[in-house]
Amino acid sequence: MAEQNILTTPSPNADTTIVPPGSPHTHTEQPSGGHGGAFPPFESHTFLAQLIWLALAFGLLYYLMSKVALPRIEAILGDRAGRLSSDLNEAQRMKAEADAAGAAYETSLREAQAKAQAIAQETRNSLSAEADAKRKTLEAELNQRLAASEATIRARTSEAMGNVRTIAGETASAIVERLTGQAPDQASLNRALDATPAVH
């Protein structure tokens, strides 16, 4: 049986033990106290591949972002901006309506106050005119009653004075007749009564 030579390419970081030909076994061992290889991303001979994969991943991510995520974000932002603009326009419209309603309310309030003052003044004038008319009517009635009362008093006074003159004449005639024994003549009696001061 012919012997064959086994040629192997040792790893840069591996310790290799070469077994001479004729040995039944070939062993590749690492020292028990040794460490493993470097972290793969830090190995210099893989930098180019890593950069290529990084560029591919970045390009794919950029493509996905530009085609999927960014349009959605742009649509959301546009929709939100549209809603904000609509809300602002609605708020401005409502503010304008509120201002107009406030101005109309103030105008109507001023008009109502002016009407109320005019009605109050008209009522006062009407009441004053009615009061003046009633006062004048009462004064006229009182004047008429006073005039009638004065006329009645004068008539009754004249009547009473006439009665007093008659009674006084009769009394004087009786006294004279009693004293002299004869009744006085009417002319002398009237002269005596006329000379007597009137009693009021």
UniProtKB/Swiss-Prot annotation:
Subcellular location: Cell inner membrane
Protein topology in the membrane: Single-pass membrane protein
Polar residues composition bias: residue spans: 1-16
Highest taxon of source: Bacteria
Database matches in InterPro entries: ATP_synth_b/b'su_bac/chlpt, ATP_synthase_B_chain
GO CC field: plasma membrane; proton-transporting ATP synthase complex
TM segment ranges: 46-66
Protein's job: F(1)F(0) ATP synthase produces ATP from ADP in the presence of a proton or sodium gradient. F-type ATPases consist of two structural domains, F(1) containing the extramembraneous catalytic core and F(0) containing the membrane proton channel, linked together by a central stalk and a peripheral stalk. During catalysis, ATP synthesis in the catalytic domain of F(1) is coupled via a rotary mechanism of the central stalk subunits to proton translocation. Component of the F(0) channel, it forms part of the peripheral stalk, linking F(1) to F(0). The b'-subunit is a diverged and duplicated form of b found in plants and photosynthetic bacteria.
Subunit structure: F-type ATPases have 2 components, F(1) - the catalytic core - and F(0) - the membrane proton channel. F(1) has five subunits: alpha(3), beta(3), gamma(1), delta(1), epsilon(1). F(0) has three main subunits: a(1), b(2) and c(10-14). The alpha and beta chains form an alternating ring which encloses part of the gamma chain. F(1) is attached to F(0) by a central stalk formed by the gamma and epsilon chains, while a peripheral stalk is formed by the delta and b chains.
Alphabetized HAMAP family for the sequence: ATP_synth_b_bprime
Annotated protein name in UniProt: ATP synthase subunit b 2
